[in-house]
Amino acid sequence: MALTPRIAIDAMGGDVGVRVMLAGAAMARHKHDGLRFILVGDEERIKAALDNHPNLRAASDIIHTDGVVSGEDKPSQALRKAKSTSMGLAIDAVKRGDAGGAVSAGNTGALMAMAKLALRTMPGIDRPALAALLPTLGDNDVVMLDLGANTECDATNLTQFAVMGAAYARTAMGLERPRVALLNIGTEELKGTDEIRDAAALLRGAEGLPMQFAGFIEGDKLSRGDVDVIVHDGFSGNIALKTIEGTARFVTDLLRRAFTSSTRSKIGFLISRPATELLRHHLDPNNHNGAVFLGLNGVVLKSHGSADAKGVANCVHLCAELIEKDITRQVTEDLANFRRGDAA
């Protein structure tokens, strides 16, 4: 039975502001009519923004606070004022069971710290991972994790990330046996750090899990679609993600310059417009907005700080989907099966 998709929205987090966050929530509700919301933040500003979205207003409750986590706040600073901030109260709604999940565009480090403290990690997990779906040249997206929550990881962390990432791929993409690979500097077994090689050995020996270990993958193959899940520490993963995002912006800007450089180029753009619009859609990060913290006893998603309303809507829709498909139960069961197999 599907869980009730009620989502707590940190209306004050990120660079986008209350109006964009609520416009995104309203767009998500148009696609997903059963959605309900808890909007957390400055009540006066929230009510003013809701004037433009009567459909959202009818489906929302408001928790007032004027406390905000800034982008400059360290996790330790954010934790000290968690109970008085929009981010902290949104997560607390998940902890109490009032919401099935939370969405914030705020400070990633603070969000991780607050979510871990409030929701706690699943049995056997000491480090949640930040996972996102990214486009590929294949038929499916690829799950990449960790994207910055943990800068240093040992072999056990990486194997747990692999199990959680595979569960996410099955839940979000409907894959029966996702192909899982470890990001490395080469595909040979002797390449990479001790942690990566040890994680590979553990994954090769894992039995009975609904996943396929595909070995190592190099950075130039991330978007080919050869695998469904790519595992790495948060330091490497964040660099890889920012490189992908930067390359997408570079290609988009390059095309814009090329097609506006002369009259002939502008005519060429009109002829090739359907193809260029398809490319722009594929490269637009708003179409893949939303990273989930895996390994927590609850659903918490991070929206890009500069996402537009469409991007926020996609993040909210993903949150609702993960609540309905009970991603928390799926990850918990897979981790338990992995531990049993590892102990056998």
Swiss-Prot record:
E.C. number(s) listed in UniProt: 2.3.1.274
Nucleotide-binding listed as a keyword: no
Domain of life: Bacteria
Entry-linked InterPro entries: FA_synthesis (IPR003664), Phospholipid_synth_PlsX-like (IPR012281)
One function term, GO molecular function aspect: phosphate:acyl-[acyl carrier protein] acyltransferase activity
Gene Ontology CC entries for this record: cytoplasm
Alphabetical UniProt keywords: Cytoplasm, Lipid biosynthesis, Lipid metabolism, Phospholipid biosynthesis, Phospholipid metabolism, Transferase
GO annotation terms (biological process): fatty acid biosynthetic process; phospholipid biosynthetic process
Main EC class the enzyme belongs to: transferase
Localization terms from the record: Cytoplasm
Catalysis: reaction(s): a fatty acyl-[ACP] + phosphate = an acyl phosphate + holo-[ACP]
Record pathway: Lipid metabolism; phospholipid metabolism
Subunit structure, interactors included: Homodimer. Probably interacts with PlsY.
Protein family: Belongs to the PlsX family.
PANTHER family per the UniProt record, alphabetical: FATTY ACID/PHOSPHOLIPID SYNTHESIS PROTEIN PLSX, PHOSPHATE ACYLTRANSFERASE
Stated name of the protein: Phosphate acyltransferase
Organism: Sphingopyxis alaskensis (strain DSM 13593 / LMG 18877 / RB2256) (Sphingomonas alaskensis)
Origin organism lineage: Bacteria, Pseudomonadati, Pseudomonadota, Alphaproteobacteria, Sphingomonadales
Gene label: plsX
